Amino acid sequence: MTEKKNNVSVLFLLFSVLFCVCLITANVLETKQISLGFINITGGLLVFPVSYIINDCGCEVWGDRKARLLIWLGFAMNFLFVAFGALADAIPGAPYWDNDEGFHAVFGLAPRIAAASFVAFLIGSFVNAYVMSRMKINSNGKNFSYRAILSTVFGEGADSIVFFPLALYGVVPTKELPIFIISQVVLKTVYEIIVLPVTIAVVKKTKKLEGEDAYDNDVDYSVWKILSVN
């Protein structure tokens, strides 16, 4: 019998699990509003940027193809979480259950918000991976810090530009939307910069353990190929 070689390493699997956990956790934390002096944010900001850091690590070590796999896996698990949460929220509670309001606040994500979140996540994540991948080729693998920060700016920028108009247009004053977008991009980029030493250490250690340092010279970045993980 011929033994089939696995295409995914244990370490990549661990990265994938952490990526999915971060996305799902961010969904739950989004229901809490946090005040930071002169600006208000959602609790999801605490953990969501971690998904972009993992995206950067995955793209840097394993390349754009594995980054696409990571993104689609995260999207699928996030969708299942939201779908089952919405289903449980729609089913009437037991007569003695008196916490429907609290449960709905966490799992009753409005369809518009959910749709905006899914679209923004896909676009932002693919932009982040694309910028990271192309810059690695153009720089011959140098300047990881610069590439990680710039890919986050573009990725988070695309995410916010898509999410806030889709989710909040007509709900908040139109003039407030640019403020939401800019503040989210700035805060998430600052987050990336703060944890950059950790990101660099993780990337170096992962490359050493995996014996991988992918360059995407033969990758097709067309829209149709983005839908593939091959």
Explain the meaning of each model-derived region.
Residues T206-N230:
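Short, highly charged, low-complexity non-transmembrane loops/tails of multi-pass membrane proteins
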Residues A88-R112:
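Membrane-interface interhelical connector segments
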Residues M1-F75, F79:
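Hydrophobic transmembrane alpha-helices
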Residues V153, G157, V185-P197:
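Hydrophobic transmembrane alpha-helical segments of multi-pass transport and channel proteins
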Residues N78-W97, F121, S125:
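Transmembrane alpha-helix/helix-exit interface in multi-pass inner-membrane proteins
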Residues V190-G211:
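Membrane-helix cytosolic exit motif
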